[in-house]
From Swiss-Prot:
InterPro entries from the UniProt entry: PsdUridine_synth_cat_dom_sf, PsdUridine_synth_TruD, PsdUridine_synth_TruD_CS, PsdUridine_synth_TruD_insert, TruD_catalytic, TruD_insert_sf, TruD_pseudoU_synthase
Family annotation (HAMAP family): TruD
Protein name listed in UniProt: tRNA pseudouridine synthase D
Family membership: Belongs to the pseudouridine synthase TruD family.
Top-level class of the enzyme under EC nomenclature: isomerase
Entries under PROSITE patterns matching the protein: TRUD, UPF0024
GO molecular function: RNA binding; tRNA pseudouridine(13) synthase activity
A GO-annotated cellular component: cytosol
GN (gene name): truD
TRUD domain sequence ranges: 154-303
One GO term of the biological process aspect: tRNA pseudouridine synthesis
Length: 338
């Protein structure tokens, strides 16, 4: 029912590669701007994990320090089949937890420990640094050509398939809540299902624009977002040369909605595309509004910055930085089949 094979901006890659044969083939390191305060109610821990989900590490840490899971916070979830570093915070006002800075358990260990005056939460990160190893690459020249292409043009900013759960399971749960009226008491799970539903509808709109080759063009009535910012404005021209130049300079991007209570910003051609996509999803839209979700906007274009690569006998190591909330897999799918 829920196909996650979204159209690609640059066609199906010629090159085929093996990805994630080892957790070390997918390395992710959190990036943030600024410094921790060094004091405050929250102990902040830099964790390295391998072959575990973020939730599994949080539960393991909670057991070792004898704290409820609800006192441990993070800025984002990290993949299980990967080697990742991320920050966790423990609410422990005025408390010293002996030996916490050297704690470790199978699959994870603590690298750094300090304090901060705020707990970690989504929005704290500026981005993530990825180091990806592709093995048995069948067509290195096609891969290199595509890397050079996306350096300047970016890729469609889809939500990755992990957003939707195994086999789209989060979307099935969202359908049960939004359409069938099922009650879910767990606020975290409910929020996760709603996020999946909104991400799905965003991807549908973006995929329509990829098919029509307009995902990176400013249509009449488009909401335009400043790159690296939540600031938006509406394009009131059919094809603005100045906007095209700013898009080429990676300054702005057309944006598509994460549905909720609408402020009716989008107009014209862009609105027509959105309405066409939404037509068969009215029950989901009504349900999201009734549950108090507010419309938000997400850039259509994702730029992978600081791209570097090394090639060694059929193995390619890629390194790049993405903003928080972006998915490395949507970059990879434009480069190789895996």
């Amino acid at each position: 029912m829920y196909s996650l094979d979204w159209p690609r901006a640059y066609g199906i890659p010629n090159s085929i590669a093996t990805f994630k044969s080892l957790p070390e083939d997918f390395q992710v390191n959190e990036l943030f701007e600024g410094q921790f305060s060094g004091e405050g109610e929250h102990i902040v821990l830099k964790i390295e994990k391998r072959g575990l989900t973020t939730e599994e590490v949080v539960k393991s840490l909670a057991r070792l320090i004898n704290k409820p899971v609800k006192l441990i916070s993070h800025a984002g979830l990290k993949d299980k089949q990967a080697l990742t570093t991320q920050w966790l915070s423990v609410h422990a006002p005025g408390e010293i937890i002996d030996g916490i800075e050297t704690l470790e358990a199978p699959g994870w260990r603590i690298l750094e420990c300090t304090r901060h005056n705020k707990k970690l939460k989504p929005g704290f990160l500026s981005g993530n640094h990825f180091i990806i190893t592709l093995r048995n690459v069948s067509d290195e020249s096609d891969l290199i050509h595509r890397i050079e292409q996306i350096k300047f043009k970016g890729v469609p900013n889809y939500f990755g398939e992990q957003r939707f759960g195994r086999d789209g399971g989060n979307l099935i749960k969202a359908e049960e809540i939004l359409v069938q009226g099922r009650k879910v008491k767990d606020r975290f799970l409910k929020g996760m299902y709603f996020s999946a539903a909104r991400s799905w509808l965003y991807n549908l709109i973006l995929s329509r624009r990829v098919k029509e080759s307009s995902w990176n063009l400013p249509l009449l009535g488009d909401v335009i977002q400043l790159v690296g910012s939540n600031s938006i404005f509406v394009n009131d021209k059919s094809m603005d040369e100045q906007l095209l130049q700013r898009i080429g300079e990676k300054d702005v991007s057309p944006a598509s909605p994460l549905p909720g209570r609408s402020k009716n910003l989008v107009k014209g051609t862009a609105l027509q595309i959105i309405n066409d996509v939404y037509e068969e999803w009215s029950a989901w839209l009504d349900g999201l509004e009734k549950n108090g979700l507010e419309e938000a906007w997400r850039a259509n274009i994702l730029y992978a910055e600081q791209i570097e690569y090394r090639i060694n006998q059929g193995t390619v190591e890629l390194s790049f930085v993405l903003p928080a909330g972006a998915y490395a897999t949507v970059v990879l799918r434009e480069l190789v089949q895996y």
